[in-house]
UniProtKB/Swiss-Prot annotation:
<dbReference type="InterPro" id="IPR036236">
    <property type="entry name" value="Znf_C2H2_sf"/>
</dbReference>
<feature type="compositionally biased region" description="Pro residues">
    <location>
        <begin position="1"/>
        <end position="11"/>
    </location>
</feature>
<feature type="modified residue" description="Phosphoserine">
    <location>
        <position position="486"/>
    </location>
</feature>
<feature type="region of interest" description="Disordered">
    <location>
        <begin position="505"/>
        <end position="530"/>
    </location>
</feature>
<feature type="compositionally biased region" description="Basic and acidic residues">
    <location>
        <begin position="187"/>
        <end position="197"/>
    </location>
</feature>
<feature type="region of interest" description="Disordered">
    <location>
        <begin position="321"/>
        <end position="377"/>
    </location>
</feature>
<feature type="compositionally biased region" description="Pro residues">
    <location>
        <begin position="512"/>
        <end position="525"/>
    </location>
</feature>
<dbReference type="GO" id="GO:0008270">
    <property type="term" value="F:zinc ion binding"/>
</dbReference>
<keyword id="KW-0804">Transcription</keyword>
<feature type="zinc finger region" description="C2H2-type 3">
    <location>
        <begin position="102"/>
        <end position="125"/>
    </location>
</feature>
<keyword id="KW-0597">Phosphoprotein</keyword>
<dbReference type="InterPro" id="IPR013087">
    <property type="entry name" value="Znf_C2H2_type"/>
</dbReference>
<keyword id="KW-0862">Zinc</keyword>
<feature type="region of interest" description="Disordered">
    <location>
        <begin position="1"/>
        <end position="45"/>
    </location>
</feature>
<keyword id="KW-0863">Zinc-finger</keyword>
<dbReference type="GO" id="GO:0000981">
    <property type="term" value="F:DNA-binding transcription factor activity, RNA polymerase II-specific"/>
</dbReference>
<feature type="region of interest" description="Disordered">
    <location>
        <begin position="166"/>
        <end position="199"/>
    </location>
</feature>
Amino acid sequence: MDPQPPPPAQGSPPHRDRGRGRGRGRGRGRGRGRGRGGAGAPRAPLPCPTCGRLFRFPYYLSRHRLSHSGLRPHACPLCPKAFRRPAHLSRHLRGHGPQPPLRCAACPRTFPEPAQLRRHLAQEHAGSEVDLSTQRAVKEEPEASWGPQDEGVEQPATVVVAGAEEEATTQWPAGDSAPAAVPTSTDPRESEAKEAEAGAAELRAELALAAGRQEEKQVLLQADWTLLCLRCREAFATKGELKAHPCLRPEGEQEGEGGPPPRPKRHQCSICLKAFARPWSLSRHRLVHSTDRPFVCPDCGLAFRLASYLRQHRRVHGPLSLLAPLPGAGKKDDKASGGRNSGKGPEGGEGAECGGASEGGEGGHNGGDATPARPPAGEPRFWCPECGKGFRRRAHLRQHGVTHSGARPFQCVRCQREFKRLADLARHAQVHAGGPAPHPCPRCPRRFSRAYSLLRHQRCHRAELERAELERAAALQELQTQASQSPQPPQPLKQEAEGLPLPIAHIKEEPPSPGTPPQSPPAPPVFLSASCFDSQDHSAFEMEDEEMDSKAHLCGLGGLAS
């Protein structure tokens, strides 16, 4: 017989209950020890003064404060992207072509990412007893302490352990002992102070680096309206060619080094000869040369080329104007744009109602799976951190951000005046342009170089226009009163004045003289049929009147009627 286990002692719970009770007791005791302020007591959270987010360590708080500064001092040398932290930049650089791979110690396979290597070790070599350390195939530069007197001595190799992605251990040659480890302090207060000091130093360094980066003048608008690159002294006719110029790209992003090559521009406009890489871009560009603006705002009367422009404009009038449907909402607008904006958010698409109204007319308040409500239209959603000015679109905020930077890279070649935007420089160049101004006033001989200057000038003629309108209304009223007071003399019929035969309806019957036999009624004209009299249809007489009037008119023009 199998030996049975001894019964539990009297008064003691079974094994399972005893284990559970022990676990619960340990957990409660450990928690009580922490709460009493022992060595493992929780630290007070550190709030961010800008957004109120809580952090456990000062270093994390100092690193988080970089996100509110908007600075990205670590720029990628291969593309225009920039990052706030060096770790993010190093992780981004792995996607730019071949990087030194990680070799597996158990097989000849290599992996570009440490996470992929760890996954490979867990799946392929989980049950085998192999050295799970892997070595990265990187040619490390010798340190400063490794001088020429140490030639022929084996140098240490940097080995990446599979269990940690960022940590590295140093293997020293056999027979040599590793340098003695520096004793580290175990006081948590000293470690917190060091972390806070390191975070503050990193923050100051990044702020100083970002403040020292100043943009220098790169582009000059010449007298012949060409854009001159000040680095290589090459001129360009359009802004697009200037942007594609290698000198204005970030360092390292030259042809064949970083990023895909630019797409060739095969679609050219036949009017202005501007080229585009995609056909829908050319179709959308052709609307610039068209004067047709079929989409009219029902609130202010402004007209637009595309329905998406009208929807964007109607946000200015507030949320009530967005409830009314657009004119021609059932049509699929922006056909020229190739449907790029169709059905993708409030900037484009077929629907015209606010809030994603359905075709059934239920509107955007049908509940259920409705999208979350957007902020009220007409109110700013993006605020400038420098001056507090609000904008409705993020693009407007980016354009406004140029005003707070001291860089003025665009300079006028005639008066040496500097500007922050290329559009401001082009508008200023109209001052030096020869010939008359392109915007004349229809009321006076003055001309203006800018359209908004003409609109501002036309306010001077507002009183003159109102006076002319009052005079015109008074003259019209006087003519109406004169016409009502003086009776008009009876005018002879047009047929009598021109000597044409009168129609039958206008012939007056003379009474017969006494003694004359009664005459039979005259025969009907040839063009009439018996059916006209039977059905009492008098349209034939009206047709005859119209024919006679047209013949008389042709006779008056020179006898063209045959």
